[in-house]
């Protein structure tokens, strides 16, 4: 009998998750830890990270909290050495941190424009490079999972034009770095979620109403519905998969 090439055992691996204090990032950190990875949980809200680390530890996992403002290039440059010293060289990176602008373009302040660009796009490119550089030097393979959005390819005009633009940029970063780093066995892939039940979604619903009534299945996605895709993209099973962005939207968006 042929044994399927599939494993979710991440023992011996070290992962970094940005934006881990809430929402999808929090779920991603817990799932990676549950499968054996040592997880560096990063975000600006250190108090919420401490709670997350306590939960992971109580479940038998290994995690550590690192305060990180992804808008600050110096902090992005410092985080890889800090994680390496505490948990070992990271070989999994989940670029999850992101904010939504929820504004029509002409109403956005320069400060908000900078925040959205720096958080959603610039940080992904900088941190991916900081992550890849030591792996390339050591000739060690790695996995990057970038969190994009179905907004990368679809925008209704109701607000969040810049968010949509940055997520399209995340898709292109995923594709271009995958090509550039394929020879180093660093796989770069992405997940493009629809609207999932998170703090960010709660805020959008509070401002604009319940979007789910317009969806074919009349529901929001649940973060746990992404577990298998995340694990696939960081496991040996996806060894030949790079430069791919997987849409997970429960049929919410157009095709």
What is each residue range found by the language model?
Residues 89, 182-187, 241-243:
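Short, small/polar-rich loop/turn modules that mediate ligand/substrate recognition or access, typified
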Residues 2-7, 231, 242-255:
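Short C-terminal tail/terminal secondary-structure segment
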Residues 128, 166, 174:
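Active-site helix of classical SDR
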Residues 149:
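Residue(s) in the substrate-gating loop at a strand-loop-helix junction
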Residues 14, 21-22:
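Conserved glycine-rich cofactor-binding loop
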Residues 133, 179-183, 239:
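Alpha-helical segment proximal to the catalytic Tyr-Lys
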């Amino acid at each position: 009998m042929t044994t399927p090439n599939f494993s979710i055992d991440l023992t011996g691996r070290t992962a970094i998750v940005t934006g881990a204090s809430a929402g999808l990032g929090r779920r991603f950190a817990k799932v990676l830890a549950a499968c054996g990875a040592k997880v560096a949980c990063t975000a600006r809200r250190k108090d919420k990270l401490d709670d997350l680390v306590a939960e992971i530890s109580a479940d038998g996992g290994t995690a550590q909290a690192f305060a990180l403002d992804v808008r600050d290039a110096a902090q992005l440059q410092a985080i890889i050495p800090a994680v390496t010293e505490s948990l070992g060289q990271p070989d999994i990176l989940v670029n999850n941190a992101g904010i939504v602008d929820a504004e029509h373009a002409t109403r956005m302040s320069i400060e908000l424009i900078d925040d959205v660009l720096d958080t959603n796009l610039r940080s992904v490119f900088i941190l991916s490079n900081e992550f890849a550089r030591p792996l390339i030097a050591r000739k060690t393979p790695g996995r990057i999972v970038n969190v994009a959005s179905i907004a990368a390819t679809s925008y209704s005009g109701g607000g969040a034009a810049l968010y949509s633009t940055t997520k399209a940029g995340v898709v292109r970063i995923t594709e271009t770095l995958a090509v550039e780093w394929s020879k180093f066995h660093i796989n770069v892939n992405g997940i493009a979620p629809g609207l999932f039940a998170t703090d960010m979604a709660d805020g959008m619903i509070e401002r604009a109403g319940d979007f789910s009534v317009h969806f074919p299945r009349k529901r929001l996605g649940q973060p746990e519905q992404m577990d298998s895709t995340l694990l696939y993209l960081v496991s040996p099973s996806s060894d030949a998969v790079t430069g791919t962005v997987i849409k997970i939207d429960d049929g919410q968006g157009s095709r």
